[in-house]
Amino acid sequence: MGKVAAKIKVMPDSPDIDLDELQERLEQSLPEGAKINGFERDDVAFGLVALLPTVIVPDDAGGTEAVEESFGDVTGVESVAVENVGRI
């Protein structure tokens, strides 16, 4: 079984949120078997900055669903969307 790399767009619920703290909370929320392989930041609008972690997950049933759910439950997260997925 291989692995999948997914770039996930995480929108904070406020432009005033501390992105470093949010990044730490996202890392702590990862389900077993998943790991983050770097973060990017994307200026969206009006001071709002999205986090774009690249997450490595096993290539099995469910794919990135567990990660998306975990990220969605993190305090300060407005929305979560998979931007790009590829096998590695």
Curated annotation (Swiss-Prot):
A single MF term (Gene Ontology): translation elongation factor activity
Entry keyword annotation includes Ribosomal protein: no
Keyword line: Elongation factor, Protein biosynthesis
Residues spanning the membrane: none
Disulfide bonds: none
Function comment: Promotes the exchange of GDP for GTP in EF-1-alpha/GDP, thus allowing the regeneration of EF-1-alpha/GTP that could then be used to form the ternary complex EF-1-alpha/GTP/AAtRNA.
NCBIfam families to which the protein is assigned, alphabetical: aEF-1_beta, PRK00435.1
Listed name of the protein: Elongation factor 1-beta
